[in-house]
Amino acid sequence: MAKFPKNFLWGGATAANQYEGAYNLDGKGLSVQDVTPKGGVPASPGDRNPLITEGPTPDNLKLEGIDFYHRYKEDVALFAEMGFKVYRTSIAWSRIFPNGDELEPNEAGLQFYDNLFDELAKYGIEPLITLSHYETPLHLARQYNGWANRDLIGFYERYVRTVFTRYKDKVKYWLTFNEINSVLHAPFMSGGIATPAEELSKQDLYQAVHHELVASALATKIGHEINPDFKIGCMVLAMPAYPMTPKPEDVLAAREFENQNYLFSDIHARGKYPAYINRFFKENGIEIQFAPGDKELLAENTVDFISFSYYMSVVAAHDPENYSSGRGNLLGGILNPHLASSEWGWQIDPVGLRLVLNSFYDRYQLPLFIVENGLGAKDVLVDGPNGPTVEDDYRIDYLKQHLQQVGEALEDGVELLGYTTWGCIDLVSASTAELSKRYGFIYVDRNDDGSGTLARYKKKSFDWYKEVIATNGDSLYQD
């Protein structure tokens, strides 16, 4: 039986744009999420890009979210009841700088997060804060074309300096960008890039990547100057790729797929562009424009830890058109015949999580942090002995299998700081903008048509996860 470390950080994760609501209260500006059309943002480049409308899209569930902005005390109390040691959320950039390019921050926005962090401290819960989680201020997308414009580095610098200074005694763990590699697949949602995906050149896309990487290194530098005790990490979307066959060409295709993701963690951990990317740049006519000081900034400000989301693995082949497509998978790929799939077509692979942990740790020898993992499902509220509940044994089974593989990785020698399940309370899906895709231990009474009371109900998994935390993982190995 694997033993989890004594000070292992168990908890859950959310994002401001998916659950706070209050999109137009207390001085908050619009973000790219507020103009997301019904149906969400497609994962694949070349599909439609959300229109930058004059105002928020009226059927957008994210405008109200689950009203965490007004209910945070109730929700934090529920997290504490489960025994959370850590809670991951994000600061909405547009709540602090409504347009993104102001000189002075919005005090009401800063005060909200003061209140939230104080509430977490009351219960001894450590905040883990993402600085930018798919929430670029809309003005920066409209006026500057998001991270395609180098000016965003300066705006981001002002923002992170503001929040690092304000919360230097309240927050220890920080993430610079959520799933930073996702900008390759969802440039508007992830990078605020307004150019339609089908018109966006690889040159401009990878230049935007460079701007984000420089901004991340700059944030790491500033954070360590403001408080040397800060622990600052990068956050990537982790997705191991398996070759479809032992054919060397398929093995190479899997390696090339993984390199596109390793690029981001390599630069964060090693402080320079890896050699393997040079061929890709050359073959695609990409020439990254470095400003004076960029290389030194990257080299001197590597991260303290690597964090990642993990939902699935993919299969790669040199001739993918000859195989069935895994259309539900985040980044497409080939259907793996050996794996089951979720209701949304995401293939379920607990062993893949062990592989990711070992791959990252072998590669970097840095502490790791699993900051997203979970099962999106259509939950049904039923009457239980203690009131309405959800009999979500499928979620318990999913999480148990994944956490047992985490235990195996710990036995393998991986250094892991903690684990936060995604959407510990039901929230609006980032990719599909619906509430029926539920991840939480806590059911929120809100439906895809916007109806509902917003009441909170504990699912069966609530008590299960509470026991996992109370036993520091030992209950995972009990029938």
Where does each model-flagged region fall?
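Active-site region of glycoside hydrolase catalytic domains
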Residues: 1-56, 80, 99-101, 110-479
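Catalytic domains of carbohydrate-active enzymes, especially glycoside hydrolases
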Residues: 71-92, 300-306
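Internal amphipathic alpha-helical repeat/solenoid segments
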Residues: 65-77, 98, 109
